[in-house]
């Protein structure tokens, strides 16, 4: 059995967001202008039934780590977010929930309620990439006053908060001030993250394209810039070592968010869609199967067996140990 137990779950709850971060997978660049990704099912949200199907599975460890990420959406934009938290704790009271948010949605009352629901091992990570004058350079459209109000409300109600800041050229001189501001609100941890696109042509490209942002327009579907790769050192099989799975906004189970991103990325999708789906596109769908049936599928053995010999391009780009 490849997964005798499940220790960590990433939930991508929706394809809904209040922000227009130019480096996000929600968007794509065409002729130096930014558009909506034409392959994403915008405004989709995972159902409560899917969350139940995941949490009731007996493979989950007692203190399972639940990571509510935002590959293509803002987790708290899910209309039934607090109900999702209740479902998690109903099945696993000791679950460690980690919520990612830009902090610019909902009300202070919502964050107070959330603080009271979360146990002592659970956290919210506020993604704040600057001060009032610089946060909007990347977190385009996020209301600064909302971030401040919601952070204060959550911390004042006893919640555990982290502020995470991606280091950009326009905010690197502010890091100490950002940390001091966060701590003044009651934030317990401040973390910086290296910008993975720093000093790359890709960053130059999206910085320029963000000046011509078509926030409501779907991009035309163009040619495929395939990124297939065969050169690799050794693949670190993170999903198996960490006993982790990923559940997307349509209720499909995958090894990680990188696999999900590949399905709607022109650089990978022509390779990855047949690699994942093969002859049955619903084998990993929780709309059609229990989580137990999904985890017993032979596909996981195929993936594991390929890591040392013929890994897919996503595994090479994300988990090659030489990187």
Q: Which functions belong to the PLM regions below?
A:
Residues 106-113:
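Alpha-helical scaffolding within the catalytic cores
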Residues 18-28, 310-321:
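Local cysteine-cluster metal-coordination motifs and their immediate loop/turn environment
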Residues 4, 8, 12, 27-52, ...:
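Radical SAM enzyme [4Fe-4S]-AdoMet core and its adjacent flexible, acidic
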Residues 99, 104:
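Catalytic phosphate/metal-binding cores of nucleic-acid and nucleotide-processing enzymes, i.e., regions
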Residues 22, 75-76:
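A short, conserved beta-strand element in the Rossmann-like catalytic core
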Residues 64-73:
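Active-site groove signature of glycoside hydrolases
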Residues 1-6, 19:
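Recognition helices and adjacent regulatory flanks at domain boundaries
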Residues 80-81, 110:
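Acidic donor-diphosphate engagement hotspot in glycosyltransferases and nucleotidyltransferases
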């Amino acid at each position: 059995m490849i997964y005798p137990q499940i220790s960590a779950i990433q939930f991508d709850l929706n394809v809904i967001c209040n922000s227009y971060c130019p480096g996000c997978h929600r968007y794509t660049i065409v002729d130096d202008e930014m558009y909506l990704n034409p392959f994403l099912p915008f405004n989709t949200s995972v159902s409560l039934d899917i969350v139940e199907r995941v949490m009731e599975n007996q493979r989950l460890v007692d203190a399972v780590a639940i990571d509510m990420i935002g590959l293509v959406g803002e987790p708290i934009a899910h209309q039934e977010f607090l109900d999702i938290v209740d479902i998690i704790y109903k099945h696993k009271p000791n679950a460690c929930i980690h919520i990612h948010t830009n902090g610019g949605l909902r009300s202070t009352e919502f964050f107070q309620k959330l603080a009271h629901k979360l146990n002592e091992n659970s956290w919210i990570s506020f993604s704040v990439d600057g001060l009032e004058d610089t946060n909007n350079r990347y977190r385009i459209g996020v209301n600064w006053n909302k971030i401040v109000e919601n952070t204060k409300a959550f911390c004042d109600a006893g919640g555990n908060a982290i502020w995470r800041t991606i280091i950009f050229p326009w905010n690197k001189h502010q890091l100490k001030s950002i940390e001091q501001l966060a701590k003044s609100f009651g934030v317990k941890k401040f973390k910086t993250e290296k910008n993975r696109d720093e000093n790359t042509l890709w960053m130059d490209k999206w910085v320029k394209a963000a000046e011509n942002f078509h926030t409501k327009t779907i991009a035309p579907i163009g040619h495929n810039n395939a990124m297939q790769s065969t050169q690799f050192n050794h693949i670190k099989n993170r999903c198996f070592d960490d006993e982790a799975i990923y559940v997307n906004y349509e209720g499909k189970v995958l090894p990680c968010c990188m696999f999900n991103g590949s399905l709607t990325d022109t650089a990978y999708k022509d390779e990855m869609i047949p690699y994942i789906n093969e002859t049955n596109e619903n084998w990993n769908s929780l709309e059609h199967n229990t989580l137990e049936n999904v985890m017993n599928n032979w596909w996981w053995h195929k993936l594991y067996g390929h890591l040392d010999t013929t890994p897919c391009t996503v595994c090479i780009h994300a988990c090659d140990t030489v990187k």
